[in-house]
Amino acid sequence: MAKAGNIERVVERADTELMPPSMYKVILNNDDYTPMDFVVEVLQLFFKMNEHQATEIMLQIHHQGKAVCGVFPFGIAETKVAQVNQFARQNQHPLLCSLEKA
């Protein structure tokens, strides 16, 4: 309500506690056709790994069938999955990137 040019303000304080966002693992899955050097390139390009890190993860994918490339909030994880899958298709590779709740 206004009183002689003064404005009365009501400020409500929320009694809710902020929760951290749910985190998701971004996973690369092995296949029999995608070249190893392409997987290393993907890891460097989309997950900012150096060559040594990318090679280690690529070998884990090759030997264990899949590997976690990073853990991110849902929106970032979803974007990385879409970017990797699109990049793989553009380069005619069946490489599959997926996500699961951490």
UniProtKB/Swiss-Prot annotation:
Pfam families: ClpS. It comes from the Bacteria. InterPro entries: ClpS, ClpS_core, Ribosomal_bL12_C/ClpS-like. One of its GO terms (biological process) is proteolysis. SUPFAM superfamilies: ClpS-like. Belongs to the ClpS family. Involved in the modulation of the specificity of the ClpAP-mediated ATP-dependent protein degradation. HAMAP family: ClpS. Binds to the N-terminal domain of the chaperone ClpA. This is ATP-dependent Clp protease adapter protein ClpS. It comes from Shewanella amazonensis (strain ATCC BAA-1098 / SB2B).
